[in-house]
């Protein structure tokens, strides 16, 4: 029997090792298509392997139970297929003459622990707190749902009689976390922490591969690490000029750099990283005359499906913009070398494999189109007041510069630098990388999502951000300190912007990783959160994993920066029949905004102490709340209706703390 602790380090480590093993087992043979350098293939393999595994296994496990034996058989089977399709000599997309050494791998691993640290519990006195990103990791409930009940996942955030209650969300990344949970016995929270850290590391690997391979300089690997940890320049501008910025800029939420996105939304970072791999595979299919593209087309199809299945924005919408443009730019070359039929056949194979792997996800997610509008056109508001004609240039000249500072300015320097003979040899790659930067940024400017917040705007540009970081790393490694115009501009950019950008990123890491441990405060809710595993263990003992519980949507709301019942989401390992409003809007997307508000208000009123026996009956019969969990913090605690009703009976309690009814 596991002790009632929040997370165990051994489970996190074992989950990380399982994810890495899956990635390398499947991705290692496929990496031959991208680079001939063995060390560089170590950088590419895990993302490729996890991408292929995620898409294929999600489809398979809609028909098979998710067990450790089945998972190992699927991994072995996919690894065998990957080795078979990659056997023999393969002419890679790039042949890197340099690669990072062991010291770089060690430093990269240690730095990429930081995003994982932002979602682990932090102790101060008798209390436990969590960093701000944990709010977006309420999706740990999805990991637990898949691990316990298989696919397709039921919605762990809402249940209602007469409704299919299917989860409408892109969950391939969470499925991968659930697989490591099944194999190791880790909780959803532990598996989520592990995969968050591994996603950050593998994303860093791919950025570094591109930086080193394109610049042909091992020093680019060292530049990639600080550049991934840069933050927005806005705090630095505020520090120098006070509130001057707020007076003339619109209050719209800005964009986010890698060090913000990696701990908050690892599924989107994973998807954006896969998008970068897919673009490179696409380039080889379009421009390589060496053959073997049919096998690569199969792998690309699975990677595309996994990118889509992990993020509708970073790996789906971004690629819908990038790939057609890159393809259009390649037409003259394809016609010149008379490879049109070969390319069309390869791309047809890619499309077929993508649809086969993504079909179940497309079918599940298409249900949202019947109830909700997903995106709207707009012009990203930059300046205060209704000056859209100024907002258009302001987006590129002001907002993107403030948000992405050093990597955006360096990308512009790289774009206008005089091409060398080496650059001309890779002109098709450079052209594709330029498109990969500009197309997602343009999308952010003219489209925004409306389900909840502007997730589209923040996530669709992840491939753009990764490419800019790689290009900046390469630029710095080859031009800093040189007497040319490009060298001087690059040196000045690094001197002025690097330090403040890293300081802003470091401040974000400190706030989410160490601040609570240093400053506290010690609070009643923090103490209750620390003790909550005992309550949820008792809930699991009386509640099967395929049933839902009713618990106050606002229980321990002060633990997170935005009020939410994070204790249920990350610790209960059970479904909830009506959770926090933000969670209902985001993850029960089949509900209209009005319906989501009605459900949320119903549960809030009930736990505030206004519940009658009829309310309790509606809970149990309409919303399928088989278990009712009441704590001493709830207004419902001690109300006579709990002792005198025909709906729920007391089955477990800890005197003065909590009671469980069935």
Swiss-Prot record:
The keyword Transcription does not apply. It comes from the Bacteria. It is found in: Cell membrane. One of its GO terms (cellular component) is plasma membrane. The chain crosses the membrane at residues 10-30, 46-66, 68-88, 101-121, 167-187, 193-213, 217-237, 263-283, 285-305, 312-332, 342-362, 373-393, 394-414, 432-452, 460-480, 485-505. Keywords: Cell membrane, Membrane, Plasmid, Transmembrane, Transmembrane helix. It is a multi-pass membrane protein. Disulfide bonds: none annotated. The keyword ATP-binding does not apply. This is Uncharacterized protein y4nK.
């Amino acid at each position: 029997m596991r002790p009632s602790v929040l997370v165990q380090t051994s489970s996190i480590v074992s989950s990380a090792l399982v994810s890495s093993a899956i990635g390398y087992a499947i991705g290692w043979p496929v990496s031959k298509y991208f680079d001939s350098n063995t060390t560089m293939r170590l950088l590419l393999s895990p993302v490729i392997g996890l991408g292929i595994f995620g898409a294929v296994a999600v489809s398979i496990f809609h028909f098979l139970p998710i067990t450790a034996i089945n998972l190992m058989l699927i991994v072995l089977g996919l690894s065998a297929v990957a080795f078979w399709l990659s056997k023999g000599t393969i002419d890679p997309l790039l042949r890197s003459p340099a690669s990072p050494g062991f010291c770089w791998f060690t430093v990269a691993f240690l730095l990429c622990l930081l995003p994982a640290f932002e979602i682990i519990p932090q102790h101060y006195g008798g209390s436990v707190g969590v960093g701000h990103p944990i709010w977006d990791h309420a999706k740990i409930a999805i990991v637990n749902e898949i691990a316990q009940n298989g696919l397709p996942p039921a919605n762990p955030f809402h249940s209602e009689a007469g409704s299919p209650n299917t989860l409408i969300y892109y969950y391939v990344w969470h499925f991968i976390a659930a697989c490591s949970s099944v194999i190791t016995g880790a909780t959803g929270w532990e598996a989520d922490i592990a995969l968050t850290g591994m996603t950050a590391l593998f994303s860093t690997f791919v950025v570094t591969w591109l930086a080193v391979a394109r610049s042909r300089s091992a020093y680019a690997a060292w530049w990639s690490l600080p550049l991934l940890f840069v933050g927005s320049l806005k705090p630095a501008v505020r520090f120098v000029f006070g509130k001057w910025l707020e007076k003339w800029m619109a209050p719209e939420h800005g964009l986010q750099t890698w060090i913000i996105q990696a701990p908050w939304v690892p599924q989107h970072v994973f998807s954006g990283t896969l998008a970068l791999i897919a673009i490179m595979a696409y380039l080889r299919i379009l421009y390589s005359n060496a053959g073997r593209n049919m096998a690569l087309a199969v792998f690309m199809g699975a990677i595309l499906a996994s990118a889509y299945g992990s993020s509708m924005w970073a790996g789906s919408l971004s690629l819908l913009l990038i790939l057609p443009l890159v393809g259009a730019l390649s037409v003259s070359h394809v016609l010149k070398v008379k490879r049109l039929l070969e390319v069309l056949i390869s791309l047809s194979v890619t499309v077929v494999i993508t649809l086969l792997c993504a079909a179940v996800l497309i079918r599940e997610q298409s249900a949202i189109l019947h109830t909700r509008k997903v995106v709207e056109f707009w012009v990203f508001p930059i300046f205060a007041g209704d000056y859209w004609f100024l907002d258009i240039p302001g987006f590129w000249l002001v907002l993107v510069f403030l948000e992405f500072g050093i990597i955006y300015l360096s990308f512009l320097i790289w774009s206008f630098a005089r091409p060398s003979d080496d650059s001309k040899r890779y002109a098709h790659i450079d052209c594709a990388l330029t498109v990969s930067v500009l197309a997602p940024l343009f999308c952010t400017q003219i489209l925004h999502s409306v389900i909840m917040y502007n997730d589209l705007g923040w996530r669709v540009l992840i491939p753009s951000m990764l490419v800019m970081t790689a290009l900046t790393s390469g630029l710095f490694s080859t031009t800093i300190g040189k007497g040319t115009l490009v060298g001087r501009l690059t040196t000045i950019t690094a001197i002025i912007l690097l330090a403040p950008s890293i300081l802003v990123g470091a401040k974000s890491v400190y706030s989410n990783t160490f601040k609570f441990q240093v400053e506290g405060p010690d609070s009643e809710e923090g103490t209750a959160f620390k003790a909550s595993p005992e309550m949820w263990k008792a809930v699991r003992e009386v509640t099967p994993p395929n049933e839902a519980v009713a618990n106050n949507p606002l229980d321990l709301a002060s633990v997170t920066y935005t009020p939410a019942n994070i204790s249920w989401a990350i610790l209960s390992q059970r479904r909830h029949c009506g959770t926090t409003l933000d969670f209902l809007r985001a993850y029960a997307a089949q509900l209209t905004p009005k319906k989501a508000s009605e459900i949320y208000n119903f549960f809030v009123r009930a736990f505030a102490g206004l519940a009658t026996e009829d309310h309790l009956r509606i809970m149990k019969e309409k919303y399928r709340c088989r278990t009712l969990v009441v704590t001493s913090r709830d207004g419902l605690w001690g109300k006579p209706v709990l002792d005198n009703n025909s709906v729920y009976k007391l089955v477990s309690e800890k005197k003065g703390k909590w009671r469980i009814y069935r």
